[in-house]
């Protein structure tokens, strides 16, 4: 059996998936790139930490995707960045999101301070019961948080 045909275990995935070969010095492990600025070699490709496309970030995304057995992964700088990125990618003007009342304050602030300007409707329920959530679902409910 050829090595690439074998099922990889978690240790192999954590160690080898997404490896960056050290072409310059021949290091046995992927180098760490401490830079925050990169030369614009091509106008179409701009590396920048906020774009999550530096070599270190790409390396980590490949590892996470392999561990989660998914096509790709995304890393973000904070939990709130993950929440807002997810919600704003799923919701459009005219959509509704239903929240449980006891949510993280940053998420509540996102809804109350930003969703109106985007035309996103939102409501809260005090209950934890599925049946109570079901009663609050509207025709335009797209997310239950």
Q: What are these model-derived regions, one by one?
A:
Residues 113-129:
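A glycine-rich helix N-cap at a beta->alpha junction
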Residues 67-71, 91-94, 139:
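Short helix-loop-beta connector
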């Amino acid at each position: 059996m050829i090595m690439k045909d074998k099922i990889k275990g978690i240790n192999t995935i954590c160690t080898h998936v997404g490896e960056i070969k050290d072409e310059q010095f021949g290091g046995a492990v992927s180098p760490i790139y401490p830079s925050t600025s990169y030369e614009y070699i091509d106008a179409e490709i701009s590396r920048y930490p906020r774009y999550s496309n530096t070599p270190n970030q790409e390396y980590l995304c490949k590892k996470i995707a392999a561990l989660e057995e998914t096509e790709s992964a995304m890393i973000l700088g904070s939990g709130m960045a993950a929440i807002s990125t997810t919600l704003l990618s799923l919701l459009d003007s005219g959509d509704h999101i239903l929240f449980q009342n006891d949510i993280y304050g940053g998420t509540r602030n996102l809804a109350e301070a930003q969703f109106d300007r985007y035309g996103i409707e939102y409501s809260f329920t005090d209950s934890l019961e599925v049946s109570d959530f079901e009663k609050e679902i509207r025709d335009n409910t797209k997310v239950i948080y």
